[in-house]
């Protein structure tokens, strides 16, 4: 039987188009802000790293919250991370970035306009037939208001994929502050301003990526309903998802 998603969570036509087009090299994704004559083109898809998720439970959230800095310093409890209600196959999965370019001029200086359009966790290579918003374990679809989009938030304009079972250890480097100032963290620097933290004791990882103000977590479903990919857009101007 073919999978049929919940209409309350389904991507609209513009969002579905954006999610598909962002990962199609050579496709036009829009035009440069304030210059409708210059297209924004998808230049390529880059695999920036892999991530280990041994528990099959996935957090997609900001790795830290600016509002909780004082609690981090005092060692006080903070809110739990936004763990997705859907589980994924335990194992190693690819993290990929969709790159775009839209050249522009600013005060006489020329820029290539290279941007990250979206970041995805690739679960399988099976074709996606539909997109739905991913709920967190504490979300209730029955309580969603018309037009409301479940999402995570980030004052620092970042998000992350992480194994939920190792969250405390994996997020710790991002939550080290002194006098309100972040302590330099020892993370693995990756392309596209991404970072990775490893927990070898649990064979689990966290990968941080750019996400303007956070974002909706989109699940790409196959004809059988399996999750093939999980996408967060970067929130660049003109983003439709």
Predicted segments, located by residue:
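N-terminal domain-onset segments
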Residues: 1-241
């Amino acid at each position: 039987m073919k999978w049929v998603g919940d209409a309350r969570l389904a991507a609209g036509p513009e969002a579905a188009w954006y999610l598909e087009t962002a990962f199609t090299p050579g496709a036009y994704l829009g035009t440069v802000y304030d210059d409708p004559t210059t297209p924004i083109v998808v230049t390529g898809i880059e695999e920036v790293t892999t991530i280990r998720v041994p528990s099959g439970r996935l957090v997609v959230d900001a790795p830290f919250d600016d509002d909780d800095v004082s609690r981090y310093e005092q060692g006080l409890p903070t809110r739990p991370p936004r763990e997705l209600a859907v589980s994924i196959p335990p194992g190693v999965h690819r993290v990929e970035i969709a790159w775009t370019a839209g050249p522009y001029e600013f005060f006489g200086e020329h820029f290539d306009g290279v941007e990250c359009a979206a970041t995805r966790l690739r679960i399988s290579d099976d074709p996606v037939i539909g997109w739905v918003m991913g709920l967190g374990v504490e979300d209730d679809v029955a309580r969603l208001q018309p037009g409301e989009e479940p999402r995570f938030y980030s004052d620092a304009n970042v998000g992350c994929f992480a194994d939920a079972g190792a969250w405390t250890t994996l997020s710790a480097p991002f939550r080290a502050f002194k006098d309100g100032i972040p302590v330099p963290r020892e993370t693995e620097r990756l392309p596209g301003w991404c970072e990775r933290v490893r927990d070898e004791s649990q064979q689990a990882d966290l990968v941080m990526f750019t996400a303007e103000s956070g974002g909706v977590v989109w699940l790409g479903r196959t004809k059988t309903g399996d999750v093939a990919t999980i996408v967060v857009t970067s929130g660049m101007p003109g983003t439709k998802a």
